[in-house]
Amino acid sequence: LKSYWNGAAQLITQKLDEGLDVSFITLGDPSIYSTFSYVAHRIGNQGYCVEMIPGITSFTGCAASAGITLGEKDEIILVVPKVDERLEELLKHADTAVVMKTSRHSLMLEELVCKDPRDKKVVSVQNCGMDDEEVFEGFAKKGKYLSTTIVKFK
């Protein structure tokens, strides 16, 4: 991936050196788990000015598509980019957990969530904001990369 980030940064800086304005379009918000950050660091480290304009995060888009709120009052919202061994401990402290890129590890996620004795509602969204967006109850098992699962503990 580093070669792609370096290539993108090189292309952008070439255009900037030509006096052009350049935009980097990304899905979601550029400050949250985005390729933008890797490219922007490379450009900024070369002395160029980088402006970041916020977008709608994919996980808040997913919540809106599912018609659910992520947090109210003093609820703790956990947002993680993937399923791994750290998640079990983190879930204990969350009132709502948002787990991104879940389809490849949905069985592990389901096992971890089911270990928690609290009542819960599980909603998954795949390809949020796209023409083939899907929202459904339960865990994402269809293998789509842009899968997010939201767990609301009660």
Regions found by a protein language model. Give the residues of each.
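A contiguous loop/helix-start segment that scaffolds small-molecule binding in enzyme catalytic cores
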Residues: L91-K154
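Generic beta-sheet signal
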Residues: L20-F24, I77, D95-M100
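Class I SAM-dependent methyltransferase SAM-binding "motif I" and its flanking Rossmann-like core
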Residues: S31-H93, A140
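Electropositive phosphate-/nucleotide-binding environments in soluble metabolic enzymes
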Residues: K2-A9, Y33, I56, D84, ...
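Class I S-adenosyl-L-methionine
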Residues: L1-Y48, V135-F139, S147-T148, K152-F153
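General beta-strand structural signal in soluble alpha/beta enzymes
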Residues: F24-T26, M52-G55, V99, S124
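Generic secondary-structure signature for well-ordered alpha-helical cores
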Residues: Q10, Q14-D17, C49, I68-G71, ...
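Alpha-helical scaffold segments in soluble metabolic enzymes
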Residues: L11-Q14, G61, S65, E89, ...
